[in-house]
Amino acid sequence: MWILLFHGHFSNDTENENKSNPNINFKLMYMKQSMKSKGFERRLLLIMWGLFLSLSAFAQQISIKGHVVDATGEPVIGASVVEGRTTNGTITDVDGNFSLSVPANSTLTISFVGYKTQTVPVNGKNSLKVTLQEDTEVLDEVVVVGYGTMKKSDLTGAVSSVGVKDIKDSPVANIGQAMQGKVSGVQIIDAGKPGDNVTIKIRGLGTINNSNPLIVIDGIPTDLGLSSLNMADVERVDVLKDASATAIYGSRGANGVVMITSKRGAEGAGKVTVNANWAIQNATKVPDMLNAAQYAALSNDMLSNNDDNTNPYWADPSLLGTGTNWLDEMLRTGVKQSYSVSYSGGTEKAHYYVSGGFLDQSGIVESVNYRRFNFQANSDAQVNKWLKFTTNLTFSTDVKEGGSYSIGDAMKALPIQPVKNEDGSWSGPGQEAQWYGSVRNPIGTLYMMTNETKGYNFLANITGEIAFTKWLKLKSTFGYDAKFWFVDNFTPAYDWKPNPVEESSRYKSDNKSFTYLWDNYFVFDHTFAQKHRVGVMAGSSAQWNNYDYLNAQKNIFMFDNIHEMDNGEKMYSIGGSQSDWALLSLMARLNYSYEDKYLLTATVRRDGSSRFGKNNRWGTFPSVSLAWRISQEEWFPKDNSPVNDLKLRIGYGVTGNQEIGNYGFVASYNTGVYPFGNNNSTALVSTTLSNPNIHWEEVRQTNFGVDMSLFNSRVNLSLDAYIKKTADMLVKASIPITSGFEDTTETFTNAGKMRNKGVEMTLRTINLKGLFSWESALTATYNKNEILDLNSETPMFINQMGNSYVTMLRAGYPINVFYGYVTDGPVSYTHLRAHET
């Protein structure tokens, strides 16, 4: 006969093989009727009886009634009550009561927006009373600020955060793209090309020079591109926006600070996490192009109207058919795939996190590809009661590939021209330019010219923490940031009319950047008389960077597939450069809280930078901000109030911008060749005069803000208004020719002024919570930019297209404003003939 045995854990004196296996299995066994052993029968009967009892208990359904209240005893209306991991559930009525039929040994999960979810075992009971506790996760959230962390409820400045749950499922390639639209006051511009970095602007463009924010990864300021990071390794991103938050970074805080924190291990058994992501990309709003017949007909009309000869091959344009759509030939569906595996865990005294990742992305333009490999290793070790070590290591290597291409050329290329000739060679216009234009075959250049950039990035730090007492610690951090990238371009020779490339060429460049950082600071955190909470951070920071660059180009290679530099017959160019900069700083921050109602944050930083002359090498950058948590006042209504947290903030601070290059204060020269007698001699030509008096661009910012949490943190609103003024903006001033220098000679001077003012709003709501959850977020930003002074009434024209400039810098206008003639309307040929003179 066949018997189904419920097999749990059995053991006796001679059989212990399953002792360590608590898993429950079902086994199908065949028992011969000849087995008449009394011991066996007794055991079999016991097993069957146990199975019967277990199945009976499992199948027993009971009707359970319950009452759900909050901490004050008020009923919670509409709370979700669900049996375990099933879809069997209900909601509480207007009195907080519910009734549900469940197995006697099941568990119930009770949840409601604004309260912590509770799991309650039934244990055969017929009635339950459940008290839900308010969920203060939003207020207790810890945000990363410069050289430390703070609870969100203690913040006095403008700080926005993006957590791992906001970015983990984003179908994008890097963390910068994942932040788009999630932080108010932050504009993120995606370059669109795989592997290229996004451009981040915080609260508008604050200068005509470099307005990019400072990037800090695991406490280390770096210029590492966000495209080099593995999104799966990022725990959170905190954006410091106003001066009271960024002044701790002094001369580098004017444009805001982006703090990126990577994931860490936690106490518990080792956990393996696998992430896989696949997405496709397509160009949007692709313009409709003329086909061959339409283009030929339109060209014939144009030539006839201009009294020019038309192309005899276009006598009947309809015979040309559709021809070539060069945009369709150039564009494709891009595919992105990324994979990562991490292993994390730890004990009470040591935690670890290790991960590896791979990203492969093909761009929407043919032959454009990007690949990246990542490795992350973080650890924490509590050596003893007073000593702790923390390490972070981020490594990535990537390859960007792609030929030379131009979307504009693809739009201008002729649809009457095929991509390739009948013999398989690349086609190209070969007749008169008036008929065929002057654009090379844009698909041929895409495949024949090769561009490759390989990068290697290594970012690491180790922090030692000495605890003198529970409230006084010393932290020392050493950071190392190394970047290597190698560019390799090859262009073969080809005879494409009307612009042939007569010489093949290969260009290579090697770039190396090394940055060393050493931070030392004390951290004090203590509460006095249970009312006065004081936090102090004070210390120093030293940072040094070295950059080395070497490039060379050789022309005329005999074979296109053998183009090592040694094989080039002609040395076209060779060059290189080296630069250094250093920054030495002293900084301090004071946080004070009285009964969690009145909050104060004051910071000061003094920076000394090698980028400025000895007359103005040092600068001081202070800030102060205040906050009032009105909801903590005794008179503020607590019971049945829709507002559970309300805070007002005000802050003012001074920050700087030193991103002007390394040697702006010294004189610079270019080489030139001049005839002296019968010979040409090399000479130095002055291009920039020295100015040892230039100093940091200075940004003064005032911020007003309000934070509000409603309906048990179901709705969270933040509003900020700001005025940001940039003074002593570094601009280039022309030198009068009466000085003896050429009229192209310039010098840096602190003269420009700019202003940004605006408002920001962030609204986050928790709409549903339980078996199905739904959260939403809305961000809105308004910013107005205006140049107040440029040290000249003459506008500075920038951003050239063809032979014309399209934007300018001018006092009274926004930065990079487009300009042109204002017309009254189109002018017709008839109108011109009527006004002939």
What kind of region is each of these model predictions?
Residues 305-322, 336-338, 407-443, 448-450:
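Acidic, glycine-rich flexible loop segments
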Residues 167, 172, 205, 212, ...:
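Extracellular/periplasmic, surface-exposed regions of secreted and cell-surface proteins
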Residues 315-317, 327, 498, 570, ...:
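Extracytoplasmic gating/loop element in the C-terminal half of outer-membrane beta-barrel translocons
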Residues 400-416, 772, 790-796:
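Low-complexity intrinsically disordered tracts that form flexible linkers/tails across taxa
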Residues 830-837:
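Conserved small/polar residues in nucleotide/adenosyl-binding loops
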Residues 2-49, 53-376, 381-396, 459, ...:
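Short, small/polar-rich motifs associated with maturation and membrane association
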Residues 826-828:
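Acidic, proline/serine/threonine- and glycine-rich low-complexity intrinsically disordered segments
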